[in-house]
Amino acid sequence: YKEEVIGKDSLDVEVIWETLYNKARPFGQQGIAMNALSGIDIALWDLNGKQLKQPISRLIGGRFREKLAAYATGFYRLDGKKYPETSVEDALKFKEEGFTAMKLKVGFTPEKDIEYIRSIRKAVGPDVRLMVDFNACYSQAVARRIILELVPENIYFYEEILTPEDMEGYKALRNLTASYMAAGEEIFGKIEINNWLKNGALDIYQPDVSSAGGITECKKM
């Protein structure tokens, strides 16, 4: 990519993106080639914003809103800590700080995950919105069981409960529950996400700007 970027005008960000994308075609439109392209694209937008003394949000067309709702996340497992006790303490601290939504990290075993989520729900009460990130670790059969057992906990969305290859599984789970199905960190580019959209596989799409093609591509997704 170096020779296609060094010495070029950073304002030609769309031209540079297309040039790099076409050059990467033999290596596929996913994985490390797209990761590298994404990083270059983000850097170009950052440079343009600094040179023009404007936020990138304005450069890509402007802001529809000035505020966004925030949720607390984290809840990572640390050696030497007891769980779910440590996470219950963290959740209560977040609630005291004013957070009304939290996203939990799970994906250990179905039994541990169910117990963990129930413990957090019991601690924070029914008015806190809970989302759960499974890091793409379960089969459709196991995910179905988890979702059905957690119906009373009123989970707002299930994130990456299946592997990114299992589009049909996501479609089935989406029709199983009133909770939203979320994924997308491993969906690369507008062409791939269009397949998911056409199949109605998800409720919430979460492309990762650092791997899905950068700001230029994510704006089109």
Role assignments for model-derived ranges:
Residues 38, 66, 97, 153, ...:
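Structured loop/turn residues at beta-strand edges in well-structured enzyme cores
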Residues 66-88, 106, 133-140, 182:
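Active-site mouth loops of central-metabolism enzymes
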Residues 55-60, 85-93:
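Short, charged beta->alpha transition segments
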